[in-house]
Amino acid sequence: FGYDEFSAHAIKVTRDAEIDIDNDVATTLIQKIEKGLKNRKKAKPTRLVFDKEMPSPLLNYLVKRLGLSTKDLLVPGGRIHNFKDFMDFPENLWKQRSIRKKVNIHPELRQASNITGIVRKKDIMLHFPYHSFDSLIDLLREAAMDASVESIKITCYRLAPKSKVINTLINAVRNGKQVTVILELRARFDEEANLHWKQQLEDAGIKVLLGIPGMKTHAKICVIKRKIQNKSQYLGFVSTGNLNEKTAMVYGDHCLLTSHPGIMADINSIFDYLEPSGFEQKKIKPLRYLLASPFHTRKKMLAFINHEIKQARKKLPSGITLKMNSLSDQSLIERLEAAAQSGVPVKLVIRGICCMHTENNKYKFPVKAISIVDEYLEHARVIIFHHHGHERTFISSADWMVRNLDHRIETTCEIFDKKIKKELK
């Protein structure tokens, strides 16, 4: 008997994902992003990953049809190219994942009847994914239902597909709270999702602001205003990571829950600046406890490094420890190199790109640099300066890159609680 033979081979095409936000004043940012999303689907291919068992005639046909011109764009692979799909597989398929330690509730919150009351008394640091992200959701839920809460202001960059954060904010506005969301539409690969969230939030009656033209809002901050006996009280949080309950299960991040009056005042100042009337004046109110990019972060970090250099040159104890995703800013790297040459012990924990030379004959001590590659993605930014033995410890949404220091709204927050400082170290 005659028969037909069929074969199937998987391919993955990577296209140029850049969305060009031009200066055409006749179109809005939303229109530009919508146009860019349409163009992305037919953008120029930059790579073809293919099944290495694919017959040459079929591969040549694909190369011709896609307009690929160099062998550098061709990557032979196996049968599966999209490993990200494994993230959505059931937990019990792999023994290693089924025996993963259960997520814990923070000890200070475990027996608490409400989180707000605890945060009013003391700072709490949540360490994701070891602590449950539900604690952050519960804080927002309490605010949504608390009759004394007047308003909630929050920034959103990347959100989960079925975001509990969004649901909580919608419930808050339904309960009569004034809710303001700074939503970043230009978060790469989340543009379409954030356009959807913008519509959802506005339909619910929430005030949605899109940040500053030409500058992404990457800060992760929130302030909740309560009115108790005609007196305003504030609490909220500063985080290194996104308000995304899905990625919080696999990304290592830190989130400070606090009612510190100075930190809350500074967060309010940042939100005032992000209002259209604020950034049109191109000025931000002086901040005392937070560092904000693009205004203060670079200058303050350089000052702290220079202080450690002076200490080392006086033969006094010194030290700098950095943990972040990327270290590529030239001016900060030059000062770190000067610190190493002066005898300052420099320790680096950099997940991604690190442009600093860690070996140099001029360094009095070798720079210790590592990258932690394990089950969780190390996303947190932590900065520690020795500072006469009274360590100055910061958490930040910003890596030490030009884009984060000069072209984005970012926040760096000093930690004052001794126990939390010890946890971070």
Region spans (language model):
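Hydrophobic alpha/beta core scaffold segments
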Residues: 345-349
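Glycine/threonine-rich ATP-lid/beta-loop region of ATP-binding domains
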Residues: 330-333, 337
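N-terminal localization/anchoring segments of enzymes in phospholipid and broader phosphate metabolism
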Residues: 1-320, 338-342, 354-376, 382-425
